[in-house]
Regions:
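Alpha-helical transmembrane segments and their immediate juxtamembrane cytosolic regions
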Residues: 1-254
């Protein structure tokens, strides 16, 4: 495998005739940098919820400052690229708008909170439902000033995504505690062969483009409730294909 990777690096040439070189790392790079920063924060803070929530709030406020306002089209804090602060946040720590940091810190807080509530009488599912409602309300309020955008990594996107994740996590924990873990077996391939499942949509997308299928999709596939439904169906198809590949012993390993 290592020899194959070295061979591919040596023979790689981009459409402009350039050899392989470092470039923007994409979403996986953003995730990696975010995990690194948040891991360091957790290393020093550990399970101190007050400090964890403070760091989450800092990331969230930073996203509000860095993202473009809907009304003006400009961010509240526009940092020049030759500025020292820009160098630290965007070139050394690579936190960008802070949205990914807020999402990751939210996950850490949720995990720590679950551990702390295990020995108490407060039902975890009730707690997560209340928190999800508060986060959704925050998303509704901030949406008056910023758009909901994953690409721009805005605050409303962070809050709405967090609300959905927290609520579903609480429901899943509750169902598992009731012995219903088997209900989620149909999506197990996504966790057992994560990298394979991650690449399946890209493979399908290229196949669709090759045969012109992507050009004949109806408009309702792109937006609204039916658009969401089509995304869910496509996701399940990808999980199903991953399951088939596992059965054929086709699996990518890291």
């Amino acid at each position: 495998g290592v020899a194959l990777l070295i061979f591919m690096i040596v023979i790689y040439v981009d459409p402009k005739g350039n050899l392989i070189r470092a470039g923007w790392w994409g979403i996986l790079g953003l995730i990696g940098w975010t995990y690194l920063v948040c891991a360091f924060i957790y290393y020093f803070v550990r399970t101190d919820l007050k400090k964890l929530i403070l760091m989450w709030a800092i990331f969230l406020v930073w996203s509000m400052l860095r993202c473009k306002l809907t009304a003006s089209g400009e961010p509240l804090l526009n940092i020049p690229q030759n500025n020292a602060l820009y160098t630290v946040t965007d070139q050394i720590l690579n936190i960008g708008t802070g949205a990914h940091g807020a999402l990751t810190m939210g996950g850490i807080i949720l995990s720590v909170t679950e551990l702390k509530l295990r020995d108490k009488k407060i039902p975890f599912v009730a707690f997560t439902t209340i928190v999800a409602a508060i986060l959704a309300l925050g998303g509704l309020i901030t949406n008056n000033f910023w758009i909901i955008s994953k690409i721009q990594a805005t605050a409303p996107w962070v809050l709405y995504s967090s609300a959905v994740a927290v609520f579903l996590y609480g429901v899943i924990v509750w169902l598992v505690s009731k012995g219903k873990a088997s209900w989620f077996k149909f999506i197990a391939p996504a966790g057992e062969a994560t990298l394979t499942c991650y690449l399946v949509p890209t493979i399908l997308g290229n196949i669709f483009m090759l045969f012109g299928i992507s050009q004949i999709r109806p408009e309702w596939c792109h937006s609204g409730f039916l658009g969401i439904l089509s995304c869910i169906i496509f996701s399940l198809v990808c999980v199903g294909l991953t399951w088939c590949m596992n059965k054929l012993y086709l699996k990518l390993k890291v």
